């Protein structure tokens, strides 16, 4: 199994249920790693999975900036950001700040379920061991 990785989880309101279902489905993989999430998303994940999640503030109250700061300190190995591409809410932070930082620090980043599943399966196979080089 792969080394301990730090995984960031963010979901817009309309995608929170999807994030819960994703974490239920991949609970056996996620429980081997450190999970970080914006406040409400983290609480909702914990409620349905019993996974331990480090919770930031709510996304619109600065939680997304807290996650971004962890990326800037090269202390994040993967980010799953389930966003609503059709109906973004005014209070929901812009995804682009996180995209930019993940590109700068070469961090695997998913914004939809298909890519998130590929990343989690790769993580479980040990395909992300190269991240160690960047730390």
Which role does the model predict for each range below?
Residues 5-31:
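N-terminal phosphate-binding or glycine-rich loops at protein starts, especially the Walker A/P-loop
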Residues 36, 99-119:
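Short, acidic/small-residue loops that bind anionic groups at enzyme active sites
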Residues 64-104:
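Mid-chain, well-packed structural core segment of small domains
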Residues 32-41:
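Short internal beta-strands
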Residues 114-135:
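Short, glycine-/small-residue-rich phosphate/pyrophosphate-handling segment
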Residues 34, 51-61, 130-133:
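Short hydrophobic/aromatic-enriched beta-strand-loop microsegments
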